[in-house]
């Protein structure tokens, strides 16, 4: 069977920081280009890292196979094969999903996805693992902050 691919971004703060830094590289390149009237080698060389980081940021994806969910991150060596049997539960809201698994350091991880992609991803996941618990949660990711605050006090 064909692999299914779904694109994602990390939680909101990390996404904003990543794309802000990426577009800073673009703006530096454009500023350098405006300093000269003709093509400017340094400006073009600075634009190359922008395209590399833009591609890496867009290429984050889930690849779903018969037995695992492959989480592809920005860095190629951080690609993680998450066995479907290790996924305990999935919660979602209109813009993000949270996957609970013992494979993650913190026990769960939040992924931002497009509104149209979330139902397709959940449906594909339910086909591969019918007994999976899927629940809607509008306070996605906030329970970690509450637990941390309780443990500090």
UniProtKB/Swiss-Prot annotation:
- UniProt family annotation: Belongs to the EbsA family.
Encoding gene, per UniProt annotation:
ebsA
Q: How does it sit in the membrane?
A: Multi-pass membrane protein
Is Lyase one of the keywords? no
Membrane-spanning intervals of the chain: 12-32, 39-59
Instruction: State where the protein is found.
Output: Cell membrane
Q: Which GO terms describe its cellular component?
A: plasma membrane
Q: What this chain does, per the record?
A: Seems to play some role in the cell surface expression of a chromosomally encoded receptor, named enterococcal binding substance (EBS), that mediates mating aggregate formation. Might interfere with the synthesis or assembly of EBS, and/or assist in the localization of EbsB to the cell wall.
What name does this protein carry?
A: Protein EbsA
Which Pfam family would be a valid example here? EbsA
Question: InterPro entries in the record, alphabetically?
Answer: EbsA-like
Q: What keywords are assigned to this protein?
A: Cell membrane, Membrane, Transmembrane, Transmembrane helix
């Amino acid at each position: 069977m064909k692999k299914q691919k779904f694109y994602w971004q990390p939680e909101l703060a990390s996404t904003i920081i990543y794309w802000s830094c990426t577009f800073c590289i673009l703006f530096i390149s454009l500023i350098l280009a405006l300093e000269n009237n003709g093509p400017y080698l340094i400006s073009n060389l600075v634009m190359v890292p922008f395209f590399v980081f833009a591609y890496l940021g867009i290429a984050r994806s889930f690849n779903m196979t018969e037995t695992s969910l492959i989480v592809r991150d920005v860095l190629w060596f951080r690609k993680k094969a998450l066995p479907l049997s290790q996924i305990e539960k999935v919660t979602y809201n209109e813009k993000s999903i949270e996957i609970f698994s013992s494979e993650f350091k913190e026990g769960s991880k939040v992924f931002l996805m497009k509104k149209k992609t979330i139902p397709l991803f959940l449906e594909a996941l339910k086909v591969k693992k019918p007994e999976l618990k899927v629940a809607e949660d509008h306070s996605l990711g906030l329970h970690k902050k509450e637990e941390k605050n309780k443990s500090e006090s």
